């Protein structure tokens, strides 16, 4: 670019010298005071600047300077930014004056030498200041404190010339000579800019430590990094280590987007992966953006961001991308002006072809002008679009970082009004929408500029008839407004409906296991379909309204042209073909702002709504930093001190959660907290973490803390990473922690040990394993204070004892520990026991001290003694009941036989598994590679009505194109070239035919638009139903191995693309192809030689498109793949915010979020760059085609071609480059968007579970009547690549008996239950219930006949009624009866809305114990013959456990009850006990017989439990 600029400058200098020679004979003194000399001097000076910049650039390239030779300067330096702004302003001002001079030429000819010299001077000024601006921008990160010597010298000369210009203006004013106002303004502005630039370049002090080596920092373009190593490291996501080539590209590479070529070349050689995509530059990375954005949101007094307003948010976003926004405004202005050059010159071109020539070589000058305008239009549009997308990426990244940061600090009260789905929507919807607003940010002022330029051209050609054009334009805009308003309302309602659907979908996906166990999945699918139906109602209104707007868009030029030409006839203004063609070309350009204005207004409103939502979210209260006074370790002799504290989750409530709390914990103390369900135990721990708002009192914590939550929070990722939790690996300590938490054996069983990847929410781990991993996480932190919220409830008795001994009394013997527990046996070891009741500490002291001092503690002890009495009675009666066990001997013998048989079988299995390939259960998201299969396109096109509408859509567009070309052809042919030529038809005939053709074309476009949205709507609906039906029918293994973020991404982002974008993408391709064929047809009518150029140009375009699409397609896929981890990380962070804060890990998680955010932004950034790389090349090719046609037209003799038809060809040719680029762009965009269909079809073909109902083999209505479960040689594995979990189990559960299943965590207990419900299908063997093989009947026939109380109590958002009876099968009386039986009736009656009392997301407004009682209520309603309890009482106290056991014994006495429990008291009174170990039966007999054998594992377990519990009363 510099080379071209310099050559132009030299040639212009020669021309200027030739003019000066003709002028020099004038009186020298008079000559020096003439404006002509000033413009000549200015042009010469700017030529010198271009030469200096060019030779500096060449010198740098030859020397290979790295560019960074001096220390960096603060990038916020006022002088640098202002210098950049001044350079841009001067370039823009020169452009405006050059344009004015240029248009003057065509009015008055080339005879005025002063005008010519002035115009050339302005041209050189525009180019030189523009190049200087680019150089300044390229070195914005590495500029020196002073400009290079040559540049400073040049600026001094420029200042002198500017002063001289003002002196000349003053002298001319004194002589009463006329000074053009625009030149006077230019001289004043230039002088002010020169003074400032001179100050910045010459007088500003150099604050660097270097000696000012004479280098050219403006041209170095070196890459620099700001922020230190940490920020750089943070920015490096999983990918190429090098920074973006964009930051290191030279000027020519920047202009042509050649910096994208290496990546596109890699994409052609191999399938692109994220590792191939270079890093973002610091200015585009969230690492660099977030601090600046945060500082802009800070209050002026440095306070919290509680005062965030919409205006402050807008201001912060603006300053985050201030430079890019200004540059895009500059390019938008240049593009708008350049796009109107063609229409302005068409009349002159037609007159030239008609023989009316004003000077020699006028035709070639016109061709050069057309070509130059096209080049400027192309360059400005490409860089405008690219930088707009950069702005969008920056805004989105900054907002996501701030939303995430707010989510980490939100108070629990603030969270209550917002579900996690809504908070995630701020990131996935609102932040994206604000980022997309960058496309529309310049439209408001551009509309005024475009309409102004159009009216100016129309006035030059048609005089006062341009007023009619203005009126028609305003009418069309006004017609668009009501449709725009409706579109806005429809979209708002559509988004609300989508939010509701996504919220419900998210909840269902989280709880899919319980839905399948209960047989409710199809009921909840119908709920999703109902929500989608509501969404489809608004979608239909939206798309049909879009069809009307599309009709207005395509019909607008017709209406405006009919009005304008009609006004010409009424006013008697002669219609000449050149003027008409100029007007038609102007109308076509005016079409865009007319169409975009409603969209722009709608987008502004939507963005305002999103900004308001985000501002209100950022204004929510954070956690109070002063709830807990945090003291450094060793600064106090008290570890925890709580004095007269009253705390409440709801500060406005009259009944605080915790009241008058007082206690002290000294270093090394063990404090136990106990109490009934809902007494405030967990709230007490939360208050020490600073989570519960404080009403009064004081809390002090001295030292670091670690927290173990009641509900395990496990991150997706490796087990090792979950335990280390940001700490460096210390192998010795790590091994000790694993041993203390009994994790070593579990890791040995897992194929990948501690490198096993945990699924979402620890889906592939048992409850006990999750609990022990989070205990290990806490231990590894080596904190001073440990807070354990019921850590032993989810593990078996043996493991619980081991944990208590090795963890609390072992590794933590010297630490302060506060632990909540329901197990009384763990209380005596405590130094202090706090008994909670109704939010108060009712008793406090050591075990023996408070044993007889109050009733609350005695109630807990009494419940425990009652449970222990059951164990003792079974043990005592074991001998007397031998004779009653004869009927069980067969079962015992079977079990023994199985054990013998399994010894050899285990060996076989081990060998088999060692050969089988094993993979992680959670795999990287599968993405298609290579080009999108044609089958995907075909399926999309034919899904709606078998593709029957497609031919009619194409026919409508073809007819529209023919009628539109016909109407323009008619106007060109039927109007004279000039006033002295007779018109071939009457004016009335002219308008009647034109109106008829225009009306016909409008009807065709209305037909096409309506059919297109109809087909698109139908296809979107079909794809939605197909995908969701397949997902809900897929086996549980699919959900275990597929993070919900991947499904959510398809249900939201991909579905939105199918709903709203794909129909228009397909339509755009068809429309553009037909338009392009029409243009080629028109141009070939004038010049068949166009084909000689057009054929190779088309071939080159197709080659470029194929070369580009390989990389672009994979980049687009990577965008989709990289979005899911960002959403998933966000979702996990919100659910685990308390744990993250308790470990003080906020910074690390923010860093991870930034890394994932940049990982998502990188492929988006390069997708934008690749698109502009392609469009630039296609624009150049089509511009060459257009110029070839023009050269041909001006080269042939006058009269050979009808000037009117030639003008028509030029009119259509003006849009050739736009259409050709648009065609390739839409093709590429279509292939990128069709990936959404590909991804949806990917999940629409997921293998389904076996049938829900098999009509030919349905069990009897009374089945199962006895409830006998027979298991034969059962083998189970979770996936073909996973090891066996159950390895040949054979046993029988007799009908009507209670069977307890025990075993270490991970022994296969829960797997056995899942197999009974066919959540997991057996690899071998069978299960029979009352003689019916469950594999031969439908899933719903099986699952709806069984009942289960799951390990994790689940409640859905809705009401108490909908949670107890989701299938709506029972009356209110039956529901109340069930609630009373499970002891929840009184609690629900207290609520104002009774059965319609609200249940929040995940049932968070009900305690864990209450949720478990709701699950008990469900099975009481269902009354199945077989009931399974999967560790159902793990989260409740002993008294509540006893209550549940009593209820079950009372109401399920004749049923088969299968109980998995960690509490011995829950299974000791069972009729049979099955003990599993590593997937095989270790023991299976009656509790009495097993207790007789003191060497049995069960006997040892009971003995340990009894001795441990009995010690509580010693």
Swiss-Prot record:
Enzyme class label: translocase
Molecular-function annotations in GO: ABC-type glutathione S-conjugate transporter activity; ABC-type xenobiotic transporter activity; ATP binding; ATP hydrolysis activity; ATPase-coupled transmembrane transporter activity; chlorophyll catabolite transmembrane transporter activity
Gene3D superfamilies, alphabetized: ABC transporter type 1, transmembrane domain, P-loop containing nucleotide triphosphate hydrolases
Distribution of this protein across tissues and organs: Ubiquitous.
GO cellular component terms listed in the entry, alphabetical order: apoplast; plant-type vacuole; plasmodesma; vacuolar membrane; vacuole
Function text: Pump for glutathione S-conjugates. Mediates the transport of glutathione conjugates such as chlorodinitrobenzene-GS (DNB-GS), and of chlorophyll catabolites such as Bn-NCC-1. Also transports heavy metals such as cadmium (Cd).
Protein name listed in UniProt: ABC transporter C family member 3
Organism: Arabidopsis thaliana (Mouse-ear cress)
Gene that specifies this protein: ABCC3
């Amino acid at each position: 670019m510099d080379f071209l600029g310099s050559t132009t400058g030299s040639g212009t200098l020669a021309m200027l010298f030739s003019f000066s020679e003709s002028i020099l004979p004038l009186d020298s003194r008079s000559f020096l005071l003439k404006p002509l000399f000033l413009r000549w001097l200015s042009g010469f000076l700017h030529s010198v600047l271009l030469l200096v910049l060019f030779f500096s650039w060449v010198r740098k390239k030859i020397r290979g300077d790295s560019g960074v030779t001096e220390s960096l300067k603060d990038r916020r330096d006022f002088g640098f930014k202002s210098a950049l702004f001044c350079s841009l302003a001067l370039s823009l001002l020169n452009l405006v004056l050059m344009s004015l001079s240029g248009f003057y030429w065509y009015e008055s000819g080339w005879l005025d030498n002063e005008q010519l010299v002035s115009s050339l001077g302005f041209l050189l000024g525009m180019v030189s200041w523009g190049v200087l601006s680019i150089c300044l921008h390229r070195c914005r990160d590495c500029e020196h404190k002073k400009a290079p010597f040559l540049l400073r010298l040049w600026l001094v000369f420029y200042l002198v010339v500017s002063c001289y210009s003002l002196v000349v203006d003053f002298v001319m004013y004194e002589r009463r000579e006329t000074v053009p106002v625009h030149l006077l303004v230019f001289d004043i502005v230039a002088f002010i800019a020169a003074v400032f630039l001179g100050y910045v370049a010459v007088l500003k002090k150099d604050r660097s430590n270097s000696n000012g080596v004479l280098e050219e920092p403006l041209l170095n373009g070196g890459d620099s990094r700001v922020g230190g190593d940490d920020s750089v490291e943070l920015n490096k996501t999983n990918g190429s280590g090098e920074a973006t080539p964009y930051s290191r590209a030279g000027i020519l590479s920047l202009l042509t987007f050649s910096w994208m070529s290496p990546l596109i070349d890699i994409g052609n050689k191999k399938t692109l992966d994220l590792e191939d995509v270079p890093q973002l530059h610091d200015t585009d990375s969230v690492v660099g953006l977030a601090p600046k954005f945060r500082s802009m949101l800070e209050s002026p007094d440095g306070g919290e961001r509680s005062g965030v307003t919409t205006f402050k948010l807008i201001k912060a976003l603006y300053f985050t991308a201030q430079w890019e926004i200004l540059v895009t405004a500059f390019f938008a202005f240049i593009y708008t002006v350049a796009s109107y050059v063609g229409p302005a010159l068409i009349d002159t071109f037609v007159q030239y072809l008609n023989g009316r020539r004003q000077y020699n070589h006028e035709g070639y000058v016109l061709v050069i002008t057309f070509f130059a305008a096209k080049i400027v239009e192309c360059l400005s549009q490409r860089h405008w679009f690219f930088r707009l997308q950069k702005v969008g990426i920056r805004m989105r990244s900054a907002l996501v970082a701030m939303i995430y940061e707010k989510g980490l600090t939100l108070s629990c009260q603030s969270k209550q009004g917002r579900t996690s789905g809504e908070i995630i929507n701020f990131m996935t919807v609102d932040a994206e929408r604000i980022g997309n607003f960058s496309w529309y940010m310049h439209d408001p002022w551009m509309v005024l500029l475009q309409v102004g330029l159009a009216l100016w051209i129309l006035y030059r050609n048609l005089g006062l008839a341009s007023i009619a054009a203005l009126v028609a334009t305003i009418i069309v805009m006004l017609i668009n407004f009501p449709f725009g308003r409706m579109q806005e309302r429809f979209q708002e309602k559509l988004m609300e409906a989508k939010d509701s659907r996504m919220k419900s979908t998210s909840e269902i996906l989280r709880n899919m296991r319980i839905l399948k166990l209960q047989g409710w999945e199809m009921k909840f699918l119908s709920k999703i379909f109902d929500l989608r139906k509501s969404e489809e109602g608004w979608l239909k209104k939206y798309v049909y309204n879009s069809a009307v707007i599309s009709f207005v868009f395509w019909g607008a030029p017709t209406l405006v042209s009919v009005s304008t030409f009609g006004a010409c006839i009424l006013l008697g203004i002669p219609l000449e073909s050149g003027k008409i063609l100029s007007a038609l070309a102007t109308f076509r350009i005016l079409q865009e702002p007319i169409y975009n204005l409603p969209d722009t207004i709608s987008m502004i409103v939507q963005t305002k709504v999103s900004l308001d939502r985000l501002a209100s979210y950022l204004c929510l209260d954070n956690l109070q930093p002063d709830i807990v006074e945090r003291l450094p370790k060793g600064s106090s002799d008290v570890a925890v001190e709580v004095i007269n504290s009253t705390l409440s989750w709801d500060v406005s409530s009259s009944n605080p959660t915790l009241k008058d709390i007082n206690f002290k914990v000294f270093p090394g103390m063990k404090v136990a907290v106990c109490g009934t369900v809902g007494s405030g135990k967990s709230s007490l721990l939360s208050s020490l973490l600073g989570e519960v708002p404080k009403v009064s009192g004081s809390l002090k914590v001295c030292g670091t803390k670690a927290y173990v939550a009641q509900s395990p929070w496990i991150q997706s990722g490796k087990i090792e990473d979950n335990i280390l939790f940001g700490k460096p690996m210390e192998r010795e300590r790590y091994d000790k922690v694993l041993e203390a938490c009994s994790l070593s054996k579990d890791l040995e069983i897992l194929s990948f040990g501690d490198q096993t990847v945990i699924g979402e929410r620890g889906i592939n781990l048992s409850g006990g394993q999750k609990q022990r991993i989070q205990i290990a996480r806490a231990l590894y932190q080596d904190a001073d204070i440990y807070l354990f919220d019921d850590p032993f409830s989810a593990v078996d008795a043996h493991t619980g004892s081991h944990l208590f001994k090795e963890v609390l009394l072992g590794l933590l013997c010297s630490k302060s520990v506060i632990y909540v527990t329901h197990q009384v046996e763990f209380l005596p070891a405590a130094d202090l026991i706090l008994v909670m009741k109704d939010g108060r500490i009712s008793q406090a002291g050591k075990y023996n001290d408070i044993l007889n001092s109050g009733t609350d503690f005695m109630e807990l002890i009494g419940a425990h003694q009652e449970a222990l009495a059951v164990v003792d009675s079974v043990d005592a009666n074991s001998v007397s009941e031998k004779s009653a066990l004869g009927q069980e001997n067969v079962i015992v013998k079977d079990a023994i036989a199985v054990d013998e048989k399994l010894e050899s079988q285990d060996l076989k299995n081990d060998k088999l598994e060692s050969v089988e390939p094993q993979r992680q259960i959670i795999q990287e998201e599968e993405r298609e590679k290579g080009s999108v299969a044609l089958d995907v396109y075909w399926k999309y096109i034919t899904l709606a009505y078998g593709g029957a509408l497609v031919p009619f859509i194409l026919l409508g567009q073809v007819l529209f194109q023919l009628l539109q070309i016909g109407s323009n052809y008619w106007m060109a042919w039927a109007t004279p070239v000039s006033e002295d030529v007779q018109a071939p038809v009457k004016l009335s005939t002219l308008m009647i035919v034109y109106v008829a053709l225009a009306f016909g074309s409008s009807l065709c476009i209305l037909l096409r638009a309506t059919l297109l949205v109809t087909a698109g709507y139908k296809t979107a609906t079909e794809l939605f139903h197909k995908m969701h039906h397949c997902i809900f029918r897929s086996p549980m293994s699919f959900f275990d191995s597929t993070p919900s973020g991947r499904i959510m991404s398809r249900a939201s982002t991909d579905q939105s693309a199918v709903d709203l974008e794909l129909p228009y993408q397909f339509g755009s391709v068809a429309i553009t192809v037909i338009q392009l064929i029409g243009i080629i047809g028109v141009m070939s009518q004038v010049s068949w030689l166009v084909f000689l150029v057009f054929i190779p140009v088309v071939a080159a375009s197709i080659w470029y498109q194929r070369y580009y699409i390989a990389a672009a397609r994979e980049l687009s896929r990577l965008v989709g793949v990289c979005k899911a981890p960002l959403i998933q990380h966000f979702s996990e962070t919100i659910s685990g915010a308390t744990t993250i804060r308790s470990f003080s890990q906020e910074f690390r998680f923010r860093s991870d979020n930034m890394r994932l955010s940049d990982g998502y932004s990188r492929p988006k950034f390069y997708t934008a760059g690749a698109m502009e790389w392609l469009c630039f090349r296609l624009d150049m090719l089509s511009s060459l085609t257009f110029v070839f046609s023009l050269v041909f037209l001006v080269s042939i003799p006058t009269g050979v071609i009808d000037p009117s038809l030639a003008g028509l060809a030029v009119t259509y040719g003006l849009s050739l480059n736009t259409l050709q680029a648009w065609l390739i762009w839409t093709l590429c965009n279509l292939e990128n968007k069709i990936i959404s269909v590909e991804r949806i079809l990917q999940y629409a073909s997921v293998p389904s579970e076996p049938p829900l109902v098999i009509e030919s083999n349905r069990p009897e209505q009374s089945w199962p009547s006895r409830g006998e479960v027979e298991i034969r040689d059962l083998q189970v594995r979770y996936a073909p690549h996973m090891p066996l979990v159950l390895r040949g189990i054979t046993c029988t559960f007799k009908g009507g008996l209670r069977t307890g299943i025990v075993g270490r965590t991970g022994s296969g207990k829960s797997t056995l239950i899942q197999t009974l419900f066919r959540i997991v299908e057996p690899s071998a063997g069978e299960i029979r219930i009352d003689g019916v093989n469950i594999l031969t009947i439908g899933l719903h026939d099986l699952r709806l006949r069984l009942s289960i109380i799951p390990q994790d109590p689940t409640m859905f958002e809705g009401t108490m009624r909908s949670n107890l009876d989701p299938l709506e099968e029972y009356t209110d009386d039956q529901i109340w009866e069930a609630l009373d039986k499970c002891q929840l009736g009184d609690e629900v009656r207290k609520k104002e809305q009774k059965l319609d009392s609200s249940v929040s997301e995940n049932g968070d407004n009900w305690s864990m114990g209450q949720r478990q009682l709701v699950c008990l209520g469900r099975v009481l309603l269902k009354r199945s013959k077989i009931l399974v309890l999967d560790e159902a009482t793990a989260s409740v106290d002993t008294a509540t456990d006893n209550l549940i056991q009593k209820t079950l014994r009372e109401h399920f006495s004749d049923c088969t009850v299968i109980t998995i429990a960690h509490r011995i008291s829950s299974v000791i009174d069972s009729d049979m006990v099955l003990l599993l170990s590593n997937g095989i039966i270790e023991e299976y007999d009656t509790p009495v017989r097993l207790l007789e054998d003191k060497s049995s594992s069960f006997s040892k377990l009971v003995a340990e439990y009894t001795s441990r519990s009995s010690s509580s009363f010693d």
